[in-house]
């Protein structure tokens, strides 16, 4: 950021006209992509020329209210023919004038030729523009596949300093955890992470999609879940093995801290009381929290994933991969966390809280699929849903607890593991209810 906060273009201070034009372009982009930013002032922090001429690239970072947004802009001659990557929105955002004259400005990630130039800036690799396609678009990032060889993710919303989720991925790569798409290059400027290039996971299937297919097969066929055509048990076991290896890798990368089970029990109560106070009077919940407070064995915390549900993983022919590290070890829930944060603000949390997140998500998949198939509830799919959930919970635990070394990180007794996971799941349920009641 320059002292005046107006950004720079090609090593020179932006003119007032350029600054206003870029601010208007950023505002237009936000309105189209999110429907937000009506009237919120835009302050251009950086305007970095990555490629001169036409097509050109100007990479813009701007402050919009409390957010820091990132928009790579492509520049082309007015009236020139452009072939945009298929998408729902018009990528043209306005006009911009630089040393090469007036240009049409557009979202660079919608133009395959410009994307290849942007990739060259980040990693100095050439790709065929005809083999560029968008594979993921969220409010926080856009991911493009290039020749089914590389995956290029550009972050739309930035944080000051290193990006927590990216930090987890890079740390796991450093310690040899190979259940991730290997990082090739990180795009970073002025202390901010702008994007990452990784290997492309060919043939990857979303974990959630596989789980939904499995439970739908069960609802269609009936009977024991292990006999259904899409039985998920073996995959749940492999997923548990992968999760344990991830936790051991995070332990190696960041170390561990002691946990306080009494504080965790208090956190569960505080989460449940505002949304479902009657749950705290149930005998099983009373006993659960008493058991949690009474635990005397060491309960370690690590830099955990933070929101490790079935939608954060994918399956390829080579096995399971963690494909999404959001929120980067900064969970929305507090049970299972250490009382002290790391120097960078990162939260240490029981690895079993990640396990609870994953197991909770399996139950949610079963319930959602049942509601989709039988909205009236007449088929009585609840029993099948619970049978599917039980089988895959058991398989996941078998895979997780069977990994060498994990008993030194989580409590060795299965009863203690049960108490911790059940308590963390209860908080997760409360967090979901709070979100639904907003």
Residue ranges and their predicted role:
Residues 52-268, 318, 333-377:
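Conserved ATP-binding subdomain of kinase catalytic cores across diverse folds
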Residues 303, 321-324:
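Pre-DFG segment of protein kinase catalytic domains
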């Amino acid at each position: 950021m320059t002292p005046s906060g107006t950004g720079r273009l090609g090593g020179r201070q932006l003119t007032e006209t350029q600054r206003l034009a870029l601010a208007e372009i950023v505002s237009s982009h936000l309105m189209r992509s999110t429907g937000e930013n009506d009237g919120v002032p835009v302050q251009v922090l950086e305007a970095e020329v990555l490629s001169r001429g036409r097509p050109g690239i100007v990479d813009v970072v701007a402050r919009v209210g409390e957010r820091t947004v990132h928009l790579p802009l492509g520049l082309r001659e007015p009236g020139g023919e452009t072939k945009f990557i298929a998408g729902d929105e018009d990528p043209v955002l306005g006009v911009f004038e630089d040393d090469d004259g007036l240009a049409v400005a557009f979202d660079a990630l919608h133009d395959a030729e410009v994307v290849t130039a942007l990739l060259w800036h980040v990693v100095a690799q050439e790709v065929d523009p005809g083999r560029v396609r968008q594979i993921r678009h969220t409010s926080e990032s856009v991911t493009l596949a290039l020749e089914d060889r590389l995956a290029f993710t550009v972050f739309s919303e930035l944080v000051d300093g290193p990006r927590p989720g990216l930090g987890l991925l890079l740390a796991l790569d450093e310690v040899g955890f190979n259940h991730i798409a290997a990082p090739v290059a990180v795009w970073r400027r002025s202390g901010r992470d702008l994007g990452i290039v990784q290997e492309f996971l060919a043939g990857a299937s979303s974990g959630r999609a596989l789980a939904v297919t499995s439970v739908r097969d069960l609802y269609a066929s009936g009977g024991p879940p292990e006999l259904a055509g899409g039985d998920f048990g073996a995959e749940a076991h492999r997923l548990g093995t992968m999760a344990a290896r991830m936790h051991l890798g995070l332990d190696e990368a960041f170390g561990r801290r002691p946990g306080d089970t009494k504080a965790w029990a208090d956190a569960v109560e505080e989460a449940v009381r505002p949304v479902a106070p009657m749950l705290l009077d149930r005998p099983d919940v009373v006993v659960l929290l008493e058991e949690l407070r009474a635990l005397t064995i060491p309960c370690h915390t690590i830099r955990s994933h933070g929101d490790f549900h079935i939608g954060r993983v994918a399956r390829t022919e080579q096995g399971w991969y963690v494909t999404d590290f959001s929120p980067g070890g900064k969970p929305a829930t507090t049970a299972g966390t250490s009382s002290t944060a790391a120097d960078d603000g990162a939260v240490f949390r029981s690895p079993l809280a990640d396990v609870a997140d994953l197991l909770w998500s399996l139950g949610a998949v079963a319930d959602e699929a049942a509601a989709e198939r039988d909205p009236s509830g007449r088929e009585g799919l609840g029993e099948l849903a619970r049978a599917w959930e039980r089988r895959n919970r058991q398989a996941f635990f078998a895979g997780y607890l069977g990994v060498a070394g994990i008993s030194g990180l989580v409590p060795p007794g299965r009863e203690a593991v049960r108490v911790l996971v059940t308590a963390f799941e209860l908080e997760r349920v409360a967090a979901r209810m709070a979100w639904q009641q907003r």
